[in-house]
Amino acid sequence: AYKAIYQGGLTIKSTQNLQIQKICDEEVADKANYDAGTKYSFYLSFQVKEKDGTIKTYTNQTMLSYYKKKNKSQNYSINFTSEEDCRAAIAQYEKDVLGKGDKLVENSEYIFITMQPQVAMTIMDQSTGEVQAIVGGRGNKAGNRTWNRATKTCRQPGSTFKIIACYAPALDAGGKTLASVQDDAPLTVGNKTYNNYTHKFGGFTSIRKAITKSINIVTVKTLQDIGVDLGYEYAENFGFSTLTDTDRNLGISLGGLTQGVTNLELTAAYAR
């Protein structure tokens, strides 16, 4: 392969659109886009060799627990206003947990500081499915093959999943049309009570209106009509790799999933 690249005329093409990628990078980096202001958090890991030779590992999670217990308060946070404040807090924690005769294990310390809030973005050509731009998070890359929030982080898709797991199968194979009507009224199934975001109900409502207004009750009742298995099957066929059998329930129509989905796969589903 090495010779083919440099001597054999092998050509490697990328789907990336540099102009679109530049716009995405600039917008993600623009602090004016974040109303709450930028905070900094971190992942921390280090080891301490205690006086008796015991090795203990400390992390950002043990740090949270330590100060919540010490301060007798659940309000302690590892979100700070600057990277310098993060490093100062880490240094103080290391000082606090080191007892007399204890030593920090050489080369055991790992600190990765990230900006908050974080962000992920995927831009895809709907006609070809080609990824034209992708953003895996805010901040400077700390190295190659680092964590990419667009391709690896799973989040709850919420109402974006209504089309995927309910209305697409309902219109395509479930015998429904945009003019089909459901009664938008209080709904309890088993021990689960469903509600709308507004906590109001509109009576008989078309699927067309339910989509434009993102009405939960109509969505759940539509999935009841066509069957959960059909909705789950369509979601699988849209290419979601993180679905599990525990997602075979009415909650899938509202995007309530066990693991969630990635930004990349959600974008790809809408580009199909």
Which residue stretches match the model-derived regions?
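Penicillin-binding protein/beta-lactamase superfamily catalytic region
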Residues: 2, 224, 255-259
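Periplasmic/cell-envelope proteins involved in peptidoglycan metabolism and beta-lactam response
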Residues: 4-155, 160, 180, 235
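Flexible glycine/proline-enriched surface loops and loop-helix/loop-strand junctions
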Residues: 5-10, 146-152, 194, 203-204, ...
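Extracytoplasmic/secreted proteins, especially bacterial periplasmic and envelope-associated proteins
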Residues: 11, 19, 23-26, 165, ...
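Active-site SXXK
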Residues: 24, 128-129, 155-182, 210, ...
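Conserved catalytic neighborhood of penicillin-recognizing serine enzymes
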Residues: 175-231
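Short, charged, amphipathic alpha-helices and their helix-cap/turn boundaries
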Residues: 226-243
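Active-site-proximal helix/loop microenvironment
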Residues: 241-272
